[in-house]
Amino acid sequence: KGMALLDIGCGWGYLLIEAAKKYGVKGVGITLSAEQCAEFRHRIQAEGLEDSLKAELMDYRDLPKSGYTFDRVVSVGMLEHVGRPNYQLFVDCVNDVLKDGGIFLLHFISALKEHPGDPWIKKYIFPGGMVPSLREMLCCLSEDNFHTLDVENLRLHYHKTLLCWAKNFHKHLEDERKMFDERFLRMWNLYLNACAA
């Protein structure tokens, strides 16, 4: 209760809202998306959590000069957007704002070994994205003296997640057609189903 929690790549803010409601954390979420930041701020207000949570439009590289310090740091599904040349910088920035004895939870999609990634996904789905290997992330973390306490492989869970996303995608296809062209919709459908396979 009362711990300071940072969510790097907080998206729409659900993780922090639940943590504030269930565990009484004081949290900050950072994102590069102005739309997500605005919606997260709206949700903070709607939940009456203005004294507990803050949404910031901020790059993780600006954390060291932010003046913030945290007991806990989480990052869920954002590392893939950092890029291999910046993995160590990312870990360094976390280290700069994490209090001594703090805990860092890093959730990411990983590969068995380092590779450049799927060319189609890199071109059409996640330009600039990169899937790190567990080995290279453990090396980066050890450079800042992080001690790995647990590693969990969620591969089978993610298969189910992708199938749910694909089902939801098809359920709302008519609404999506108002926002995206058929080419994009076919690509997104292929991406979800190919990754689930």
Residue ranges and their predicted role:
Residues F40-R41:
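Conserved SAM-binding loop
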Residues G48-Y60:
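Conserved SAM-binding strand-loop segment of SAM-dependent methyltransferases
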Residues R61-V73:
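A short acidic, Gly/Pro-enriched loop at the edge of an enzyme's catalytic core
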Residues I109-A197:
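Substrate-binding/catalytic lobe of Class I Rossmann-like enzymes that use SAM or dcSAM, i.e.
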Residues G2-G9:
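Conserved class I S-adenosyl-L-methionine
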Residues Q88-D100:
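A short glycine-rich, Lys/Arg-flanked "PGG" loop and its adjoining helix->strand segment in the class I
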Residues W12-Y23:
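Conserved SAM-binding loop of SAM-dependent methyltransferases across substrates and taxa
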Residues G101-I109:
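Conserved beta-strand signature within the Rossmann-like core of class I S-adenosyl-L-methionine
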